[in-house]
């Protein structure tokens, strides 16, 4: 699978533009796991190339079991009907010079796209990293996901180096 690595250097605190009717909170309890899995599977189901379906055990093993997991690192966007419409997680990737914050699994429901939810979630994640003293955010996305690549470029992420 060809993966694009992108990064953004933050030169000032990120500006968070709120979305009308959307509230963001952090992971609260086990009820969030089922809603998150549903969101991820819905958001990525038509991706080309496709992403395999996630399960609740996947969430517990790949998200919650991560060494730096805290509820504060998972951002959940809800609409006025309390439906989960978007999510992003902040993870830390280890490197020789210490941990680096990474944007992980940004997802927005297809019927809630182009409303500014993804942009707001990215800004909130960047703000959380900024408050912890980090000035660069990295991410990986599949090279075939053109819409994702266009979005990340629009919010200031630049290509690093492709890997296999």
Predicted regions mapped to residue ranges:
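A conserved beta-turn-beta hairpin within the catalytic core of GNAT-like acetyltransferases
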Residues: 71, 93-103, 113, 132
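Acyl-donor-binding surface of acyltransferase catalytic domains
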Residues: 1-21
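Conserved beta-strand in the GNAT
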Residues: 76, 83-92, 100-102, 107
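A short beta-loop-alpha structural element at the N-terminal edge
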Residues: 23-38
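Conserved beta-strand-loop-alpha-helix junction that forms the acyl-donor binding cleft
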Residues: 110, 139-149
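Conserved GNAT-fold acetyl-CoA-binding loop/helix
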Residues: 44-63
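Conserved GNAT acetyl-CoA-binding A-motif
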Residues: 129-141
């Amino acid at each position: 699978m060809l993966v694009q690595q992108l990064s953004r250097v933050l030169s000032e605190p990120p500006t968070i533009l709120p979305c009308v009717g959307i509230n963001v909170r952090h992971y609260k309890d086990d009820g969030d796991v089922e809603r998150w899995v549903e969101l991820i599977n819905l958001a990525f189901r038509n991706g080309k190339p496709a992403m395999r379906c996630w399960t609740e055990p996947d969430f517990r093993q790949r998200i919650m079991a991560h060494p730096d997991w805290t509820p504060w690192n998972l951002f959940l966007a809800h609409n006025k009907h309390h439906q989960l419409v978007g999510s992003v997680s902040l993870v830390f990737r280890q490197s020789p010079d210490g941990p680096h914050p990474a944007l992980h699994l940004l997802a927005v429901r297809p019927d809630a796209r182009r409303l500014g939810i993804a942009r707001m979630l990215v800004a909130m994640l960047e703000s959380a990293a900024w408050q912890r003293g980090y000035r660069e955010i990295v991410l990986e996305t599949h090279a075939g996901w053109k819409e994702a690549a266009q979005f990340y470029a629009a919010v200031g992420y630049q290509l690093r180096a492709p890997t296999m």
